[in-house]
Amino acid sequence: MGALPWGRRLGLLCVVLLCGTPLCCGRPDPRRREALMQLEMIRGIGGSVVLNDKEKLLDEKLHQLKLQDMALPEFPPSMHFFKAKPLIERSPVFSFLQKMPKGAALHVHDFAMVGVEWLVKNITYRENCYVCFTADNSVRFLFSAGQPKPQTHCSTWILLETLRRKMNSTELDNSFIRNLTLFAEDPDEAYPDQDVVWTRFEQAFLVAYGLVTYAPIFKDYLYEGLRQFYMDNIMYVEIRALLPPTYELDGRRNSKDWSMRACQEVLQRFRAQYPDFVGARVIFTVHRGLNLTEAVKAVEEAVTLQRNFPDIMAGFDFVGREDSGRPLWYFREALELPEERGIHLPYFFHAGETDSEGTDVDQNMMDALLLNTSRIGHGFAMTRHPVVKELARKMDVAVEVCPISNQVLKLVSDLRNHPAAVLMAEGHPMVISSDDPALFEASGLSYDFYQAFMGFGGMRSNLATLKQLVVNSLRYSSLSSALKDKATAALLEKWDKFEDEKYLNPSLRQACI
């Protein structure tokens, strides 16, 4: 199970390279077969990782756990996540992954970080919280010192405290939770196509908007989001944030600078409570439905934010459904502005989150690389673009793979068929992330790690695969080189502790696995 020593690897490679007989002649040579198999293993994610003796023992145990899950009559990665989730939560492999240090989460959206139960059971019970009900059976929330002004296509605002006295609070809370997530008992019936699921997906963000943008809640929400990721053994987070205006109880609006200062304040407070947490940074995002003039303004805002908040401002991105938004090439004049002014504004573009081959949107990955993106968000379409894939590899641009998101949003049904399985087998630069975990009733990274580890890698992926993915998460982060080195050293120390205390101590091994 462990990676071979480099000497033996090179020897096997020599067998392949120096053996001059054609593959098709005579009887197949077992040595050549073994060499080719090892060459495939070496090329994959984790293929260059050499496991120590402790890791080899742990890897053997992990292999046995994987065999148990593979033998199940229902294999979770082949099922829709909403149906697979209970099976995943019973899996000892999932328990292993929960306890494993996972490094960084590099693709997470601001309004989908925190479990919706916390939003409903905590935030909606606070004073001055109003609700209205829309014509399409959704809800909106607003905090106000007095009766809010009527909102188009919504009922009269009702103080939640008053409403709860008139009806069953449990049923009301459950209805709010349903509006804040995409969960459905029969997801294929509820979401027959991408248009339907994307409409529901974007509506869920609108439901959360009035809660999360209330200034006091904004800070509490961010703190709770960091806490939930930290409890999943994540030490660093990069948050894609729209930075909409937050509002006060009297209706006053705050600027983006206020939001960034709030992020700094929350992060400082969080690190004081959890000193081993490395930190968090913001990738400022705008919707890809903007016109060019609006995009220019947004890029200029990003440059200003980077100048004013260099410690937490990581870069810029567009969000929203690629298939219904404008392609990156449309925005090139806006995106070229920083370089023309001698300013380096890092880009972290969503690209290739589509199955619409041959369209303008299908060129977004190529254009992202031409615009010198630091990473590619999703990259689902990459295996259909060999030149893009080769260029991304040469530029060392990692793909942020979000398995559950791609499945729920109907790009793929069986995760064994996800294009990232090919990227993983080829050792393409990649990280695993969770995109919008709260909307999928997931949390942190463990669920997505499970789907990738079991679905993409099958029995070939092992502890070395996991270790490489975890280290990649810091390697491809926006941290400075010095901070990356420091964070990676801390991560590897946590990794060693994870091995020793949780899985190699005989008194704990059975309890933990």
Where are these regions (language model features)?
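Metal-cofactor-binding active-site regions of metalloenzymes
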Residues: 2-513
